[in-house]
Each structure stands twice: as C-alpha cells, then as structure tokens.
Amino acid sequence: QIKLVDRTFNADPDRARQLFRFILDRHRRSHFHFEIAAHLLDDETLALLDEVPPGTFQFEIGVQSTQDATLRAIDRPAALERLEHAVRRLKSAGRVKLHLDLVAGLPGDSYSDFLASIDRVAALSPDHLQVELVKLLPGTPLRGRAVSGGLRFDPNPPYTVLATSELT
C-alpha cells in the first residue's frame, strides 16, 4: 500500500487527475491511500474516479467538524454540501473506500455540536469513521490561541486537549 498524506493533494484538480490517470494506467494492482479535500472534487475528477477498480483507492477525508463556526475558528473552512455530494457520489459508485475523520475538542464545538457532527458524517455511510482528540502541536496557530480560546491541554506529547470552554 502506498500512502500520500497531503490533505491538499487535490487542491489542483488538473494535477490530481493526471496522477490518478497515471496510477490507473500503470498500477491497477496496487493500493493507494490519499488524504484529500473532498469539497474540492469536481465532476470531472469524480467521473474519472468511476474508473477506479474497487479497492485500489482509499480516501481519507478530514471533515474535522460539521459546524461552520468551528471550521472557521480552526482556519479549515469547507463547503460541507459539496463535501457531502462528493462523498455520496463516491459511495454510490462503490469503487473508492472512504475514511472520514472528525476531531473532538475543537474550539467552539459544544458536546451537542460534536454529536451533530457524528450524526451528519455517519449518515454518509463511510467505510470508516475515525474520531480523534485535537492535539495542540507546538508552533501551530491553534496552540498559540489555546489559552485565549479556553483550551487546556497536556504539555507533553502528543499535546492532547483535556478541556475546552465548552467541554470538560
């Protein structure tokens, strides 16, 4: 299995299609894991992905949260409706395995917000739904805003958030 762990892999749709086509033309027996931004998958790319032999590609999609305010707070705005459209289309084609990620403990996310995110993402029927606690890595903008944002975290690796102003 070959993993490409760059969540901006498909930020340039033409480049992503070229790489997908290269793989499909030469490596149909290999397995590839991509981190992608599903809201950036356009119709042309989705049509190309209809050609993928089942089990060849797995997409890891970092949804993080389905709350717009939370996504803005972590500088990860996403067109959730477009993301959901892409995931539904990929799911209905049944060719790409879908691994969707949510993060617990994000600033601004209440317990009910987080449960709503789980419900909304689970409704997409991904092959795998992963929930992680947010980590405040040194040098990141989120860690820089931790105290003012009401985040308490373990100062030792992996720097897991222990409480937020909304969750304890």
Regions found by a protein language model. Give the residues of each.
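Conserved SAM/AdoMet-binding glycine-rich loop
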Residues: 1-107
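Catalytic cores of alpha/beta
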Residues: 42-49, 107-125
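Flexible glycine/acidic-rich beta-alpha junction loops that bind and position SAM and/or redox cofactors
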Residues: 13-14, 63, 68-74, 104-113, ...
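Short, hinge-like loop/turn segments at secondary-structure boundaries
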Residues: 20-22, 50, 117, 146-149
